[in-house]
Each structure stands twice: as C-alpha cells, then as structure tokens.
C-alpha cells in the first residue's frame, strides 16, 4: 500500500460513508493522472512526481469534515475550508495519530516529516482561489491545483476542457482566472 492508501483508509474507513470515499478516490485519481501528465509533458519543470502523485491523491482529504450534502459530505465546516482542514488532518496524522503505528508495519510506506509537510501544503493551497494567503507556491503545488481545475466532484470522471475550467473559475474573480491562464501557458500541452 502507498502512504495515501493508509491515510484515506484512516479518514474514510470502508463502510462508513462509501459514497464519499468512492467520490474522493475517483476524483483524486483523475487529478493525479492529469497532474502526472503535466510532469511528463514538462520534464523541464523538474517536478517531483511522487510529491505530485501523492499530493493529488490527498488534496481533498478534508472534504469529509465539510457540509456539502450534494456530494455526500455531512460535516459541519464550510466547503471552502476543505483545503486547510485537510492540512490539519494530515498534520494530526504526521504528529502520530493512531495511523502512525500502523505504518511501522510497512517501512516502504513510512514517509518522513518533510514529505508529509509537503502534502499538508498541497492540501492547504490546492484551491488556488478564495483563500488569501494560501496560494500555491511550489511547482508541485501549482501542478496539483492546475490539474484539479479540470475535474469537479459532481461529474468526477469527466475532464473539463480548458474553456470550461476557465469559466468555472470566473465566479471567484479575475485574479484567479489570470493565474489559471498563466498556469496553462506553463503546464498545458506543448504546441
């Protein structure tokens, strides 16, 4: 098992809210695949593919604590906060919550603190809009954020076109649209 499998199993145990777990897995796999496409299309970026893949799989871990019934989230927090909430959840895990002991059984899946801190940052910063001060900064954070804009949780397996992704950002204001356009120039398909 990969580290994200342990973490997802911990926060989304099978049989608890299987509809939300499946939605998270499908969405995250789609984002991970798209993010890895960026890494492979743009090796000049020097992005760490393991950080990108794992970050994409964990970027939405915080939705379980949010209130968004239309996508099976029955928590109490506003959905806009799912990124920082996910970062807090990963910090709890990193500091040794119950899952830490399980990882000792499989040394291959035991990341160091630096790796998990990178995952926390990706969670906190992946929305890229709506939360001042939490904009993605590293190349890996930006790639996950960019890839995430092409997928929704209402139709998780359908990849949006560039224009559809752009339109979905307009409600958050022009600055986010301009950032996405810049990312598309940097991360989009080569001509």
Specify the residue positions occupied by each region the protein language model found.
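Divalent metal-dependent phosphate-bond-processing catalytic cores, especially two-metal-ion Mg2+/Mn2+ enzymes
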Residues: 19-45, 58, 93-98, 115-117, ...
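Acidic/His-rich, divalent-metal-binding segments that scaffold phosphate/diphosphate chemistry
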Residues: 1-79
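Short secondary-structure boundary micro-motifs
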Residues: 7, 13, 63, 106, ...
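Generic beta-strand or strand-like secondary-structure segments
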Residues: 85-92, 118, 122
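Acidic/histidine metal-binding catalytic segments
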Residues: 43-54, 96-126
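Intrinsic structural disorder/low-complexity segments
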Residues: 62, 107-110, 187
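Metal-dependent catalytic cores of enzymes that make or break cyclic nucleotides
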Residues: 65-84, 91-92, 96-107, 132-137
